[in-house]
């Protein structure tokens, strides 16, 4: 008999209890006429619920967060943090230094100027391991973006995800110890020209010239020196080179480095020069800086240094290249160097090519045409021979810099290692006189009495002073408590016994005579009236104490706010803590001359690729306007004209019968305990259609009085600009040749003495 297994029925005890009560109730109802029974039903208590089972949940760390932490550290080039995230097995396989070098090598070889970016694509997580798929983009300045999808494997160690590292985490192609190698494609560097197309810098053959002084025949020496002077257009003078030859000859006949010259410039003289005993010519090919023209504007190139190799590699440069270091060579690197290209190879550990990872072509370099006028620039450089100082010449109505000279100057060709004279002369570039320092834009000087232009503007704007305001200009200023200041006329009286004080002057006459007491009074008066910042605010409105925006390196100077009555007097005449650059001064003097517009100065006229279609052409940029009325500006202009035209003007005797309309201001800025700086600034208003009017600033460090030294140079620059030649300075026998270390002093009757503080 087949047994049938009945299904088990499970009935909860509570249901059985309820069923029993119901049965008893029915039974009682069926007992006829039995006496009624009142029953109170009390249910049994419910069984207590079972306690909740104890469950411990162990959470797995966020896989994506771990991957992002690693990739973010890579993006930030935080290699120590990346290494700290590796598994112990990975750390055992590669040291931190080797790990770091892997990433740095890729960044350098691939020229990752902008680093990397990444994107998480997906993830897969198990209790003990995980995989994260990500896309990495390497941004190469040479071959463009390199994009790869890669897998990161992670292991759980001590409750944290750790990266299982191998080379493929950088790029899949680097698996197995492969590495990258860049084959650079470098366009030829473009030239730099003056505004008229004359080459200032170009690739060409050159020759280093030197003398074996022991072999030079003394009876031929003068002829040889004169030939060198002609070859170098007067840059090297017999009176300078001759004593050097004698000194070297008398001390063993050593080799004397003389100069270098472009091969085509040497050609007409080469046969004659080679005929002199002791002359040594060493040819070389280089990026040649013609005639050392405007080296502080053009700049120079030099080799990449050891500590720069990695940084420059990231920018697409080979370790053995030369780069722009200053001036336009630095500013215009992206134009002059062109767009570099390259082929990025994957190489196996034996050095064999595995594949080409990326490739790009070059784009041609672009020439820079400067605003400089070659002949005017050479004239400005010659005018500074024997001085330490600077000259700036700007187009009065556009801000274009026509000449910018700084002295002492330097020869950029000495940075060329194939120049035979380089190793012997390059040390001179780092002497105490700092020839590499651009005094025109980086030199910061007290402005002296030239600053009175600013103070006069502040006085007129205040409403307290008018052109008719007068002041008795005596020898002394005694408005300060317990301090007496002396006018320049008193200092001269102590020397010559006859210079008289200027007497009663109107405000414009005060500028014409450069009366210190008048301007001391203005500074103190404005300060005492609570107009503490009137002069400093005006100075900033004239563009001082801020960058001009020119393309090359510059300093901002300093315009202080007076903190005491004595400060207020010092600041009013451009002394105290007042500092300016010659470029700033030329810029604001141009604004005074053009009606009040401050232009952003520039040395770049246009940028031109090989096809001849400029990618940039200069247009004037207005920086601001002088914060004075046209009426007040006219008053200042007239006063500056009187500095030159009025017989009592401090520069009158420098411009006798001068054919060009000019306005200016002398300045002699005290620099104790040394001699003062000589200043002269001014502008022309000739209005010739073929020659735009100019503004000029001249400063000579610790040279003396502005009227004696700087004013004649200003006059010569104006002559050269308009006529192509200049007269001889008082200290010269001919242009560029000094006759004495100081100019002769011409006695002039008072009050025509020209010294100004």
Put a short name on every predicted segment.
Residues 391-396:
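Short hydrophobic alpha-helical segments used for membrane anchoring or interfacial signaling
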